[in-house]
């Protein structure tokens, strides 16, 4: 919904010409946000209109903030903290990046695909997480520059679409996921 997207972008201070990258996760070593910041720095050299939004909190927050300040990109990075409205917020972004060292099946990644975000994640994440063709898996052995070039290439001239039907077809509707989680916890 373009109207909702516009409202969210306005709330977050994202200008019309800016490209909004997001990351959702606890600020911990396993989520690999230090590498994400390296990727983002490379994105800024390709196009100065990139912005990074980090949703989550954790023990590495101050260390990550120091790194961002030392790279002089603090005006382009926003920490949003822990949010209960991630599914709503992600509608305002253009891309979600998950460079995790290891991960199961991140719910935020499924939500991102439902909102038709381009998703770039490490190949350590289960291939079961791929629902749409707009999800790309990259090796962590690639450089931050390689990741940045791939992200920029994927976002160039991209048009958004409605993935609701695709998500439901793949078995990821709210009801289906809730029932699967209940079964896991109750068994």
Tell what function each PLM region has.
Residues 1-14:
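A short helix/loop element that forms part of the nucleotide-sugar donor recognition site in Leloir-type
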Residues 12, 159-187:
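A charged, aromatic-enriched C-terminal amphipathic alpha-helix characteristic of glycosyltransferases
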Residues 19, 23-42, 59-65:
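A conserved mid-protein helix/loop that constitutes part of the nucleotide-sugar donor-binding site
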Residues 21, 36-37, 52, 147, ...:
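A structural motif in glycosyltransferase catalytic domains
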Residues 65-81:
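Nucleotide-activated donor-binding/catalytic signature segment of Leloir-type glycosyltransferases, i.e.
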Residues 82, 101:
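Aromatic "clamp/platform" in nucleotide-sugar-dependent glycosyltransferases that forms part
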Residues 118-122:
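Short hydrophobic beta-strand element within catalytic cores of glycosyltransferases
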């Amino acid at each position: 919904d373009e109207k909702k997207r516009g409202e969210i972008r306005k709330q977050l201070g994202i200008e019309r010409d800016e490209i909004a990258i997001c990351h959702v996760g606890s600020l911990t070593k396993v989520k690999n946000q230090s590498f994400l910041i390296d990727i983002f720095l490379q994105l800024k050299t390709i196009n100065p209109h990139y912005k990074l939004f980090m949703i989550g909190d954790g023990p590495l927050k101050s260390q990550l903030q120091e790194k961002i300040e030392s790279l002089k990109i603090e005006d382009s990075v926003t920490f949003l903290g822990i949010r209960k409205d991630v599914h709503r917020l992600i509608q305002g972004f253009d891309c979600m990046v998950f460079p995790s060292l290891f991960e199961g099946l991140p719910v935020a990644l499924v939500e991102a695909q439902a909102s038709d975000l381009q998703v770039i994640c490490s190949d350590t994440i289960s291939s079961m997480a791929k629902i749409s063709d707009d999800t790309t898996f990259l090796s962590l052995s690639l450089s931050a520059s390689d990741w940045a070039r791939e992200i920029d290439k994927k976002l160039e001239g991209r048009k958004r679409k409605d993935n609701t039907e695709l998500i439901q077809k793949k078995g990821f509707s709210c009801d289906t996921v809730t029932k699967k989680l209940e079964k896991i916890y109750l068994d």
